[in-house]
Amino acid sequence: IADLGGLRLALRALKATDGFNSTGLIDGFTPVQRFFLSWAQCWRQNITQERSLQLLTIDPHGPNELRCNGPLSNMPEFHEEFGVQETDPMYKPEPMRVNIW
């Protein structure tokens, strides 16, 4: 819940900046696409399966992959910016998307 809410607020803050509309494509990505790519970079990890299983028992947070992909798949902006289709792994039908705050 907090990850999704925080991501929504951060995207809203990005869109409210003075330079948001003046920043065009960089390396072929829009500002919003770069925002989502930065989010994904935050959650990257190189971890063994053993350590991953250990974290499931001691860490109150979900696995990084779920913390990254869960909020993204619930955001219409993500679907729009990347043209996510029904056949894509990150696709979530609109009625199934969580909308908090």
Please identify what each model-predicted range represents.
Residues 1-101:
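Zinc-dependent metallohydrolase catalytic domains
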